[in-house]
C-alpha cells in the first residue's frame, strides 16, 4: 500500500511537529540493513519468518544505514526542536523491516528524506493539529485533496503532569493519494490506530498517576502567585513521549505497529478484474452447449432402453460433432473447430481483404452483416471452412448458422453460410437474388495471379475468387456504419490483427447494445413508429441499411435475455397500475 503513517505532536513552544513516520519503499531498496541489538538472533528470526512478524522483531529492528539524514534534507534545524519535538536521538539512522513476501522495506524516520514527501507530511501534520479536527478535539477525521494527498487523522491527548491542562495533544495520520482506497480502509484503520492510541494513553496514565502521587501539581499551581510575565513552568515543560510513557523501546514498537498497519491494510483490499455480465455471445454459446448436452443425454437414454451398449463420453462427443457440423462450427472451444482454424488458408479478415480485393471484400462483408446468405462454391473444403471461420467473426454468435459443405443447395432459412461442391446446382432465383452473395473458387490459369501475396500463401496461388451478387454494393455509398469502421481498422497497417480483433469485439458489443435498446423499445414496450424513428436517430442508426442490420442482429439475442427482459420490464408497470 502506497501510504505514510506518521505520529504528530502539538508542541507548546514550536507548534505542530512530526515526531515519527513510517513509509513503504518499493524501489530503490535501502541498503546496509543490519540488526543493531542482536544480529545473530535477528538473522535467525528472518530465516524462520515469512513476511513481517512484528512480535519477534521488536528487539532487532535494524537502523537503516542508507536512511540517515542528508545535509540537504528539508527537516527542521536542531535549534527549532525541543525534547517534545524530537523522537530519535541525534545521529540515529532510523528503523527498517524487510517483507520477504513482497520485497518491500518499511522504513521509519522522524521525517521523510524526500523533500516532496516531507512537505506533504508537514502540511498534513499542521492541518491535523490545527483546523482539521473533530468536535471535542479528539477522534478521527478525513480531509485532503488530489494535489497534497488524502489524510486519515486521529487526534488524541496524552497525560502530562507538567503540561498546561495536564495533557498534550497528539495525532496519528495516514496519508494516501488514493481517496477511494483510504475511505474503504476507514473501519480497519480506525480500529487498529485506536488500539495503538489506547496503549500509549494507558502507559502515560500510569506515569501521570505515579507523578501526581509523589508530587501533586494541581495544589502547587494553585498556590503559585500570579505574574503577568510569560515563563516556562518548572523549567522542563517540553518532555518527550518516551519520558511520558516511560518506555525506552517506544519508537521501535511504533515502527513495528506502523509497518504492520501498512502491510495489513494493503493486504485486506485487493484489486480484482470484474468481467461484468456475460455477453450475448457467451449466453448463446451456453444455450447451444446445454441443448447439445440434452440431446446427447436423451440419445443415451434411448440407446439404453433399446439395449444398445452405451458409448463413452469422448466417443459420444465426437459422434455428435460429426453429425451436427452446424452446431459444432459455432462453438469456439471445440477442438475440431480449432484444428480447422489452424489449417485454414484465410488467417484473418485483413488477409481475406488482401486476397479478394477491397471492393469484392466490401460486397461480401456487407451481405454477411445484413444476414444475407453467403455461398462459397469450390473443391477445397479447408479453404471454405477457413473463410467461414473468418467471416462469422463479424457477427454475433446467435446470428450464425453454418453448413460447412454440402452436395446440394440449402435454403437461406436453414443457414446464412453455405459451402457447396462444384457439382452442386444453385437455383436461378438465388443467383439473381439481392439477398445472397456467391464466391466461386476456381482454379487459376496462372500461378502468379496474386503476386502481392506472401511466399507461404502458396495454396491461394492456385485459385481465382469470383464474387457475384444480385445486389452489388457501390463504393461511393455510405452504407453500414459498422462496416465503414471495420474497413478503416483493416486498412490501417499500423494496427496489428490482435488490436483489430479487439476493435471488432468492441464494435459488436456497441451495436448489440443498440439492438437491446431497440428490442425493448419495440417488442416489450410496443412504442409507435414515430418514437422508434426518434430512437434510431439518437442511436445513430437511422439509415436504411443500419435499420436492417439491427433487425437481423435482433434474432441473435439469447433466449435468456429475452425471457428475462419480458418478465422484469412488465412487472413494474403492473405494480404502478395497481397503485
UniProtKB/Swiss-Prot annotation:
Site for Essential for GTPase activation (GAP) activity, residues: 164
Sequence ranges assigned to domain uDENN FLCN/SMCR8-type in this UniProt record: 86-242
UniProt keywords, alphabetically: Cell projection, Cytoplasm, Cytoskeleton, GTPase activation, Lysosome, Membrane, Nucleus
Tagged with keyword Membrane: yes
Record-level GO cellular component terms: centrosome; cilium; cytoplasm; cytosol; FNIP-folliculin RagC/D GAP; lysosomal membrane; mitotic spindle; nucleus
InterPro entries found in the cross-reference section: FLCN/SMCR8_DENN, FLCN_DENN_C_sf, Folliculin, Folliculin/SMCR8_longin, Folliculin_DENN
Primary localisation category: membrane
The keyword Ubl conjugation belongs to this UniProt entry's keyword annotation: no
Entries under PROSITE patterns matching the protein: DENN_FLCN_SMCR8 (PS51834)
Record region (Disordered): 32-52
GO molecular function, a single term: GTPase activator activity
UniProt note on regulation of activity: GTPase-activating activity is inhibited in the folliculin complex (LFC), which stabilizes the GDP-bound state of RagA/RRAGA (or RagB/RRAGB), because Arg-164 is located far from the RagC/RRAGC or RagD/RRAGD nucleotide pocket. Disassembly of the LFC complex upon amino acid restimulation liberates the GTPase-activating activity.
Swiss-Prot/TrEMBL GO biological process terms: cell-cell junction assembly; cellular response to amino acid starvation; cellular response to starvation; energy homeostasis; hemopoiesis; intracellular signal transduction; lysosome localization; negative regulation of brown fat cell differentiation
Compartmental location: Lysosome membrane; Cytoplasm, Cytosol; Cell projection, Cilium; Cytoplasm, Cytoskeleton, Microtubule organizing center, Centrosome
cDENN FLCN/SMCR8-type domain: residues covered: 337-491
Domain dDENN FLCN/SMCR8-type positions: 493-558
Family: Belongs to the folliculin family.
Subunit comment: Component of the lysosomal folliculin complex (LFC).
Role according to the record: Multi-functional protein, involved in both the cellular response to amino acid availability and in the regulation of glycolysis. GTPase-activating protein that plays a key role in the cellular response to amino acid availability through regulation of the non-canonical mTORC1 signaling cascade controlling the MiT/TFE factors tfeb and tfe3. Activates mTORC1 by acting as a GTPase-activating protein: specifically stimulates GTP hydrolysis by RagC/RRAGC or RagD/RRAGD, promoting the conversion to the GDP-bound state of RagC/RRAGC or RagD/RRAGD, and thereby activating the kinase activity of mTORC1.
Name this protein carries in UniProt: Folliculin
Organism of this sequence: Xenopus tropicalis (Western clawed frog)
